[in-house]
Amino acid sequence: MYGAIIGDLAGSTYEFEQTKNIKPIRTNEIITKDSFFSDDSILTMAILQSILKHEDYETNLKKYTLSYLDYKPNFEPYFKNSFSPGFIKWTKGEKDGNSNGNGAMMRISPVGYMFNTEEEVKENCYKATKCSHNTKEAIAASTLVTLTIFYARKGLNKKQIQEKLNLNYKDRKLERFNTSCADTIDICFYSLFSANNFKDAIKLTLEHGGDTDTNCCIVGSMAEALYGIDEDLIKECNKHIPDNFKEKLTQAYHITKLNVIKKRKMPNNNIIK
């Protein structure tokens, strides 16, 4: 779950300019002094709270959105709102939850980390997704993200995960700013499985440009389970997020006994080329 937030921070400062001009981003810094959390992290925390407190997913997604509706990072240029117009309308009951947007994928990682059977992961992924993204495309995409996390937690390697989930995504160049699951899923899984550590997975994702904070949030959420995260990144992340985020994360990792800070050597057994 820290991986999702670190990914969000990594892509946060690039997203606005990418809406005007898609271009690759090459950097050695994952988190900079200007990095900030966005709706990706906020809604990830909404899902996590639902699990920790046994609360309704839809209720907390709407609650968190309304609570952070006026949130704006200390960074310019930026969007008028931290949430998409369509999601705000859904939150206020002005729009049905039939989106196929990549927001379904970016917030879902706690489900993959907090449940211990494949059935529970699938069931809760469906519940957490369908309220706002009730399309086959969005539900399928978020399910792939959570199952990738779940299988990595269980010790499957990259090749085994790709074969089990029938993942064969190719590298692609973004011609426009990506917002749908279909536009996003290829570059996320390509970046994840083409890397051999967390930082490289994020860097590969940034090189594709586009919806950088969401893309990196999705990849980071899965890369954490596959590769672990260096302790320095966790410490740096904690400087950029509110105390209530840190408290929920601490509680979640304590309950699950997950060790986010680890370095797992991964063989270069990629299927994706």
Q: Where are the regions a protein language model picked out?
A:
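Structured, active/binding-site neighborhoods that engage oxygen-rich ligands
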Residues: 1-273
